[in-house]
Design a protein with these regions (language model features):
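Terminal, regulation- and interaction-focused segments at domain boundaries
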Residues: 1-34
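Ser/Thr-rich, low-complexity intrinsically disordered terminal regions
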Residues: 28-54
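C-terminal structural segments of small proteins and small subunits
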Residues: 6-7, 60-90
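A generic structural signal for beta-strand entry/edge sites
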Residues: 3, 41-43, 59-63
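Beta-strand elements of well-folded, non-transmembrane domains
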Residues: 10-12, 26, 50, 68-70, ...
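Beta-strand residues in well-ordered beta-sheet regions across diverse protein folds
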Residues: 47, 56, 65-67
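Generic alpha-helical secondary structure
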Residues: 11, 15-19, 23, 39, ...
Length: 92
């Protein structure tokens, strides 16, 4: 198991400003349903093969946290890059 935390600063004031852009960016980075997304209030819950995580808005930052088990843990670098890209795109 591997834990992953990403933080991306933003000038946006809350998840309501980021939600649509974050959904679109994640769909682009993870096409074909590779990553399942579910909104629970202002928290985006994520899941995929061997991975569970969430993205929230905390203190002026988008914060992503995930636990990666097999097979996702073997692709940590790629997952970190794609989630980070989506978060930076949404935060801009």
């Amino acid at each position: 198991m591997s834990d992953l935390t990403l933080e991306v600063p933003t000038t946006k004031t809350g998840m309501e400003e980021i939600r649509a852009a974050l959904d679109a960016a994640l769909a682009k980075e993870f096409p074909g349903g590779m990553l399942r997304r579910n909104w629970a209030g202002d928290v985006l819950e994520l899941s995929g093969p061997g991975a569970k995580g969430m993205i929230s808005f905390e203190d002026g930052k988008l914060v992503g946290r995930a636990t990666l088990g097999p097979p996702a843990s073997m692709m940590r670098g790629m997952i970190e890059q794609k989630i980070g890209t989506a978060m930076r795109t949404a935060a801009a």
